[in-house]
Amino acid sequence: IFTEYELREHQEQYASRIVKTGNLTLSIKGSYGIKPGDKPFKYMVANYMAVDVYKQYEYEQMELKSAGPNYAQNGRSGWGFGKILSRFGTNHEVNYLTFDFYDSMNDILNLRSNTFKFTKSQLAIWKSQDKLRELKNSHIMTLIASER
């Protein structure tokens, strides 16, 4: 889809912004609202999760049974979930990633700017989820270019 010239120009333009490079190998555990061959979403939030090695099965089941199927309730257009395979050990706290996909930056910012008052049952659900994982970081990303 992109010419060699376009790819080279794009890479040169953004190369100066790179602070650190690396790679992650993920096992995709689940996704909702995403189909192979679909055009990629323009906006994504990557959530970096630390999960105790002894609670990984329970954590995966929680994500697959509650977070994934309910992705649209929080304004998300899609959701994904993966386990990091290429890094392991006590020096690597983050061992899972979740991906929230959005149609607009405004959707992300509105969700983040709202302060929710939880009901007792909602609070109990969130606290039970927090016993299984700890959100270490969250990054908003914008799709710059894609090729299918």
Where are these regions (language model features)?
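Short S/T/G/P-rich N-terminal loop/turn motif that feeds into the first structured element of a domain
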Residues: 1-148
